[in-house]
Regions:
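Sec-dependent N-terminal signal peptides
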Residues: 1-23
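Short strand-turn-strand beta-turns centered on an Asx-Gly dipeptide
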Residues: 152-153
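Active-site-proximal cofactor/substrate-binding loop regions of enzyme domains
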Residues: 21-143
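Ligand-binding face of N-terminal immunoglobulin V-set domains in extracellular IgSF glycoproteins
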Residues: 149
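Short, conserved sequence motifs used for protein processing/export or organelle targeting and
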Residues: 122-127, 131-142, 159-292
Length: 292
């Protein structure tokens, strides 16, 4: 189901100057111990030979690295879809296959612009439509449609066109220099943080925090898919802009909104897009329960 009549496929990476000149739509920012000294009246206890002094002092809680569900640098594949589009189920099934791969971070963004034709998609959010339109502007064709897949923020294809998408994934691995990200959790405070490495970036990158559910099934009662049971994989339930990375090594505290938690997500991901909606140069996915 197309919103425009033109389709341009293939990997496209804009020059840094082009990214810097882009003015895409912008989503609103969502937001020990020491041993005691012995008394002068009592001799200090002797430490047995087999015991080190460090063993007598309780260790401070150590930050725990959260194990990522994907490889350090997965290729991000974003499907823009709708329960109101009868062309989307094959693309959803394909995304389910991609979601099983360790070298890919597959996400399903449900858009809202087909809600008017008979069925309101309960996973749709205007923010996801904004993201798709911004990608269209960055890629240069201004076109949005469903099912549309964006690979690594650098190329688009019809979501059910497996050959084109597979080729774009392979190209992304060779043409984009992906950065490894690390998520850590402080057991004492419960704070979740993102460790950003030093990287040579042509322009600053926007950091997006995404939550998603692994699998959903819904009975569609009206619209183009009336009478069908549709399955969606890695269904995005929230999208937050959490910071900007200028290439310097740093640590960023991650705070998830109460609304995002209320959606009972299964997984979380951090995606770094150059200049808001340019190529994805870093990503990491992790289990929601390990962090929050």
């Amino acid at each position: 189901m197309k919103f425009s009549a033109i389709l341009i496929a293939g990997l496209l990476i804009a020059a840094p100057s082009a990214w810097a000149q882009q003015s895409p739509l912008v989503l609103p920012m969502i937001e020990p111990g020491q041993p005691m000294e012995a008394s002068p009246l009592e001799p200090a206890p002797e430490i047995p030979d087999a015991t080190s002094a460090d063993e007598l002092v309780p260790a401070a809680p150590q930050r725990q690295e959260i194990e990522a569900e994907t490889t350090p640098a997965p290729v991000v594949v974003e499907l823009f879809t709708s329960q109101g589009c009868n062309s989307c189920p094959p693309a959803e099934a394909y995304l389910g296959e991609l979601a099983k791969r360790k070298d890919v971070l597959a996400l399903s963004f449900h858009v809202d612009y087909w809600d008017y034709i008979g069925w309101k998609d309960r996973y749709a959010d205007p923010a996801y439509t904004t993201r798709q339109r911004a990608y269209a502007k960055t890629l240069g064709d201004g076109m949005v449609y469903t099912p549309q897949i964006i690979v690594a923020g650098a190329s688009d294809a019809v979501g059910s066109n497996r050959g084109t998408v597979d080729a774009a994934i392979k190209q992304a691995k060779t043409r984009l220099k992906m950065q490894a990200l690390k998520i850590e959790r402080d057991p004492a405070s419960g704070e979740v943080s993102l460790e950003l490495p030093e990287a040579d970036l042509p322009v600053p990158a926007t950091l997006w925090l995404v939550t998603y559910q692994y699998q959903n099934q819904d009975a569609i009662k009206s619209g183009e898919n009336r009478g069908r049971k549709l399955v969606s994989f890695n269904t995005v339930r929230s999208l937050q802009k959490v910071g900007v990375w200028d290439g310097r090594a740093s640590t960023l505290a991650l705070n998830l909104s109460a609304q995002a938690k209320a959606n009972n997500p299964d997984g979380c991901a951090i995606i770094a897009n150059l200049a808001d909606y340019g190529p994805v140069i870093a990503a990491v996915a992790f289990d929601f329960d390990e962090a929050w």
